[in-house]
């Protein structure tokens, strides 16, 4: 009898599960819906559309009148060509399918099946209506039962399709015993002591805000002042206090200020103010529905600077009731996503290459950019250099381009556009190469302004020129130094400088990508947290390196980068900049050194100077600090770039470490390069239809002598190291790194050295065993 009762209860549970069973059939029926079959059609019956020519296409000639069609397959059988498409059939049946769906929703009775017995999908509104009929007390139970069913469908089970898994008794008991989650009372803490907790909440909100009385003179809106208060800016910088009123007054502005002086907000605040003036009273729903042209277009020379500008302006707009939509258009990211963002963007920030690629393929985007109210060119001296950014010139020409059939009245309907240009260096003489021969002419500010006026189409004849530091381009709190060393000893002195500045965020600049790829693994082998950044890295890897380097808890990190990181990057806490190579131009030295000593902070810039770089270093000092010498201003010290003396005895103790690390890093780099070269030659041989033999190819090229022979021999030697030899070198280096560098302890007489034995007994930590003097940067 007991078994029968169990069977009956089991059948009752099956009978009670009919409604979920229909839900299962309903969802599987959607998957079984077949696509419309494709049939051969005539060419004339296809829905041809006329091709719209882009505005950037200057000479179309015979390409006018082209037509295109989508979703068509071309099938060729011998000499017979047929066109296969499903478009005509879908057009004929489109209305019938829509009417059928509407009838099924209204019937509600036999909506799941028709006369033929075929399963049809049930729309979601019927499910919602059944939920509304259930009392509120039982809604939670129904929802809880529905959630495990979704998990079973995702995970899959042994039951066949269309059947439903019957819950066991244990599962039922667990569901019944499981207590329901009671809603959390968010105001529980306030109920305990309302007055106390309310004022604590107000104190927490106001903790990060500062007084913004210094911004009142600029006549900014209350939303902008509140945002500046949350960002912690109590007063404007000199470039902001002079440039913002001119921009708000409607003038074209050329702004020059030292690195780290707040040039981003100098043009970002007026742009946001103008947007709030025009669209600030609209709600979010009205903003989504409205179609409006972008307010500003900002051009940047590098991807990293573009993303940083986006972050700064987005932070400024955060917390406002209504704020502009900021979109970044850079390479390395999805083009389709950027096109969607541009369709609703109010402020567009991008690099010239990707921006030109996106807008040149869309007439709507190019037409919208012609209506921008602000054109901002950040780091203008770099963007407008001849032969560097061809796309930037194309974009500037496209913004001013008008068709011949357009009337002059249509041109007047476009809103007036302000052109804002900002950089730390406008001097043309700073862009000349330091390694060149002969005398190089200096150009004054008037010639630099003429250069800009030729490149840009300013609305005013003479834009407002704002120069807050006409004498020096360098930051006031920056200390500059130089270490003289041999060309092959730069790695050794670089490691010594890093050990002399422990727990300092350091940025190392090189002139080549190869140097970045070589130095980064070498420093990592020496237990230094080094990261790399160069233009051949994918965008995600570049952003990941900057993120790891700029973490607040990673103060001793090192970033080895090319000049791609020299302009505009604002990474907090960078205290030291090391120039592994002499910069090619003086303006690049200014921008490299500007990554430290930003705002009111202090920093150091050290140049590693080899014998072949002495002439270039003299020219660098003459160009960068010439105005200081003429005006008798600047630093009080005898030299503008002081020569630093590093103890040669200390450097010699570090040489075994660096030698081992170089061998390990060079071996890995040579093997990687060999594999890359072999793949390239092998692919070329396959394309030519020639058999490739690596040994024969290497034998043919081995007899050649000339430039690069010594380098190739070293690479071959490093490539020939086995795993065992590399492992032995790593073990030897590990033993050296485990010991502190002995710079003051006598191995024979313990008490005769300069080391404090008491500190040794206490277990004092550090890289040095003994006292090491500074390198002289601390002295004024």
Curated annotation (Swiss-Prot):
Organism superkingdom: Eukaryota
Region annotation (Disordered) ranges: 1-47, 88-192, 700-721
Motif (DEAD box): 378-381
Gene Ontology cellular component terms for the protein in this record: nucleolus
Residue ranges with Acidic residues bias: 94-107
SUPFAM superfamilies reported in the protein's UniProt record: P-loop containing nucleoside triphosphate hydrolases
GO molecular function term, any single one: RNA binding
Pfam family, one: Helicase_C
Similarity annotation: Belongs to the DEAD box helicase family. DDX24/MAK5 subfamily.
Binding residues annotated for ATP, in chain numbering: 257-264
Keyword annotations from UniProtKB, A to Z: ATP-binding, Helicase, Hydrolase, Nucleotide-binding, Nucleus, Ribosome biogenesis, RNA-binding, rRNA processing
Protein name, entry field: ATP-dependent RNA helicase mak5
Motif (Q motif): 213-241
GO biological processes: rRNA processing
């Amino acid at each position: 009898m007991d078994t029968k009762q169990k069977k009956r209860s089991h059948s009752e549970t099956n009978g009670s599960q009919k409604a979920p069973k229909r839900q299962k059939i309903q969802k599987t029926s959607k998957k079984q819906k077949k696509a419309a079959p494709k049939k051969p059609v005539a060419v004339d019956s296809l829905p041809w559309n006329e091709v719209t020519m882009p505005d950037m296409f200057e000479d179309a000639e015979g390409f006018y009148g082209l037509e295109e069609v989508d979703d068509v397959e071309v099938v060729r059988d011998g000499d017979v060509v047929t066109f296969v498409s499903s478009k005509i059939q879908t057009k004929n049946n489109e209305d019938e399918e829509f009417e059928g769906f509407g009838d099924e929703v209204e019937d509600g009775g036999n909506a799941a099946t028709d006369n033929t017995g075929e399963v049809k999908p049930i729309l979601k509104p019927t499910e919602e209506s059944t939920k509304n009929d259930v009392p509120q007390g039982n809604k939670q139970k129904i929802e809880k039962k529905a959630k495990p069913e979704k998990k079973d469908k995702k995970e899959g089970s042994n039951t066949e399709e269309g059947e439903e898994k019957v819950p066991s008794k244990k599962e039922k008991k667990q569901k019944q015993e499981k207590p329901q989650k009671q809603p959390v009372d968010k105001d529980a803490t306030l109920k305990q002591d309302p007055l106390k907790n309310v004022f604590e909440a107000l104190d927490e909100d106001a903790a990060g805000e500062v007084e913004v009385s210094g911004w009142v003179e600029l006549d900014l809106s209350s939303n902008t002042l509140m945002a500046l208060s949350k960002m912690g800016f109590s007063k404007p910088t000199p470039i902001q206090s002079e440039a913002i009123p001119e921009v708000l007054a409607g003038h074209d502005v050329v702004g020059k200020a030292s690195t780290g002086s707040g040039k981003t907000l100098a043009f970002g605040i007026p742009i946001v103010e103008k947007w709030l003036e025009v669209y600030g009273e609209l709600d979010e729903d009205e903003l989504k529905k409205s179609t409006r042209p972008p307010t500003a277009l900002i051009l940047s020379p590098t991807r990293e600077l573009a993303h940083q500008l986006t972050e700064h302006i987005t932070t400024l707009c955060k917390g406002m009731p209504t704020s502009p939509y900021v979109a970044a258009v850079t390479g390395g990211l999805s083009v389709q996503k950027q096109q969607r963002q541009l369709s609703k963007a109010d402020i567009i920030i991008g690099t010239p290459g990707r921006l030109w690629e996106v807008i040149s393929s869309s007439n709507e985007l190019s037409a919208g950019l012609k209506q921008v109210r602000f054109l901002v060119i950040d780091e203008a001296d770099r963007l407008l250099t001849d032969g560097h950014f061809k796309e930037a010139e194309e974009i500037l020409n496209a913004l001013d381009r008008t068709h011949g059939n357009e009337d002059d009245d249509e041109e007047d309907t476009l809103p007036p556009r302000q052109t804002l240009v900002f950089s730390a260096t406008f001097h043309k003489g700073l862009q000349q190469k330091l390694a060149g021969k002969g005398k190089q002419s200096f150009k004054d500010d008037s010639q630099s302004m003429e250069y800009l006026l030729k490149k840009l189409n300013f609305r005013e004849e003479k834009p407002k020129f704002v120069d807050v530091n006409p004498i020096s381009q360098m930051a006031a709190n920056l200390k500059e130094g130089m270490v003289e060393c041999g060309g092959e000893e730069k790695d050794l002195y670089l490691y010594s400088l890093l050990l002399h500045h422990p727990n300092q965020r350091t940025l190392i600049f090189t002139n080549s990508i190869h140097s970045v790829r070589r130095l980064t693994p070498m420093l990592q082998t020496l237990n230094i947290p080094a990261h790399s950044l160069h233009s051949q890295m994918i965008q995600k890897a570049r952003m990941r390196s900057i993120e790891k380097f700029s973490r607040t808890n990673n103060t001793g990190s090192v970033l080895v980068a090319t000049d791609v990181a020299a302009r505009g990057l604002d990474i907090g806490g960078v205290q030291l900049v090391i120039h592994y190579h002499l910069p090619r131009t003086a303006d690049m030295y200014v921008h490299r050194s500007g990554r430290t000593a930003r705002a009111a902070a202090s920093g150091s810039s050290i140049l590693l100077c080899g014998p072949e770089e002495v002439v270039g270093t003299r020219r660098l000092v003459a160009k960068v600090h010439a105005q200081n010498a003429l005006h008798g201003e600047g630093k009080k010290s005898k030299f503008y770039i002081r020569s630093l003396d590093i103890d040669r005895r200390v450097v010699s103790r570090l040489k075994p470490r660096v030698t081992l690390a170089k061998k390990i890093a060079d071996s890995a780099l040579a093997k990687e390069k060999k594999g890359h070269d072999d793949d390239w030659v092998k692919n070329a041989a396959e394309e030519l239809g020639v058999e490739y033999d690596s040994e024969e190819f290497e034998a043919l090229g081995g007899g050649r002598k000339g430039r690069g022979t010594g380098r190739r021999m070293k690479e071959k030697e490093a490539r020939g190291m086995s795993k065992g030899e590399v492992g032995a070198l790593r073990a030897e280096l590990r033993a050296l790194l485990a010991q502190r560098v002995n710079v003051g302890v006598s191995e024979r007489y313990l008490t005769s050295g300069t080391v404090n034995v008491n500190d040794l007994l206490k277990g004092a930590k550090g890289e040095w065993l003994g006292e090491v003097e500074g390198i002289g940067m601390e002295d004024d």
